[in-house]
């Protein structure tokens, strides 16, 4: 063995440098949070549970253009459009999302011309059966009604970058 290797092993250089590193982090603030009791910050572009939004007058925003269905890479969205109404607009009769297939990429949200389908701030939506992850139009509208305030705030914060 060379002299420098003997000196390193006798002086425990690696052990001492590890202890110094550990002590440096010991006195810094914690980097973790106690999750169920503390919530971390979620930015305005956070992608959580899907929601269908309504206009302030209560009418649903979706115009049945089917762009979200076409762009979805996982083919998780199924839409059926109703007949045209007297004013020339269409609405959906069926809007289903298979949340098991969804990869939360946000492309449906980007493709929507009227901001009808969004990925909201909710990420705590665990279920016990697979069938509960098949969202229909009513479930999506309820999510939109429940999270509308946060969704509108996030869209407004992100608007300059769109």
From Swiss-Prot:
Domain 4Fe-4S ferredoxin-type: 52-82, 93-122
Subcellular location: Cell inner membrane
GO MF annotation, one: 4 iron, 4 sulfur cluster binding
Main location: membrane
Membrane topology qualifier: Peripheral membrane protein
Function: NDH-1 shuttles electrons from NADH, via FMN and iron-sulfur (Fe-S) centers, to quinones in the respiratory chain. The immediate electron acceptor for the enzyme in this species is believed to be ubiquinone. Couples the redox reaction to proton translocation (for every two electrons transferred, four hydrogen ions are translocated across the cytoplasmic membrane), and thus conserves the redox energy in a proton gradient.
Protein name according to UniProt: NADH-quinone oxidoreductase subunit I
The species this protein was found in: Methylobacterium radiotolerans (strain ATCC 27329 / DSM 1819 / JCM 2831 / NBRC 15690 / NCIMB 10815 / 0-1)
């Amino acid at each position: 063995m060379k002299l420098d290797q003997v000196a390193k092993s006798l002086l425990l250089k690696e052990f001492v440098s590890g202890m110094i590193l550990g002590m440096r982090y010991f006195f810094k603030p914690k980097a973790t949070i106690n999750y169920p009791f503390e919530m971390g910050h979620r930015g305005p572009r956070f992608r959580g549970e899907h929601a269908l939004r309504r206009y302030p007058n209560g009418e649903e925003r979706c115009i049945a253009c089917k762009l979200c269905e076409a762009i979805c890479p996982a083919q998780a969205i199924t839409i059926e459009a109703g007949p045209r109404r007297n004013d020339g607009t269409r609405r959906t009769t069926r809007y289903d999302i298979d949340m098991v297939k969804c990869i939360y990429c946000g492309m449906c949200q980007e493709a929507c011309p009227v901001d009808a389908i969004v990925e909201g701030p909710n990420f705590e939506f665990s279920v016990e059966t697979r069938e509960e992850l098949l969202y229909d139009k009513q479930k999506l509208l309820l999510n939109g009604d429940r999270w509308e305030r946060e969704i509108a705030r996030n869209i407004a914060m992100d608007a300059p970058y769109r």
